[in-house]
Swiss-Prot record:
Protein known as: Large ribosomal subunit protein bL31B
Quaternary structure (record): Part of the 50S ribosomal subunit.
Gene Ontology CC terms: ribonucleoprotein complex; ribosome
InterPro entries: Ribosomal_bL28/bL31-like_sf, Ribosomal_bL31, Ribosomal_bL31_B, Ribosomal_bL31_sf
Amino acid sequence: MQAEIHPDYRQVVFIDASTGKKFLSASTVTSNDTTDFEGKEYPAIRMDITSDSHPFYTGKQKFTQADGAVDKFNKKFAGFGFKNNEDK
């Protein structure tokens, strides 16, 4: 194996841009920014979305577009003899 061809694998702090929560993880990503985390200074990477702010993980996920499309379809074709699963 060749020496010194792999990037440095080090501890990095990822910061959620919308909530400000910090996550410590190992990564090869580089950054000039630094931040303090639990008394130590680490390179900082700002993220737009993390598990702290993503709707899937926060439980604030909305299905309005899909639900609206299904309701619109059911209303449009209600008179054609199609039955809903609830009617069976």
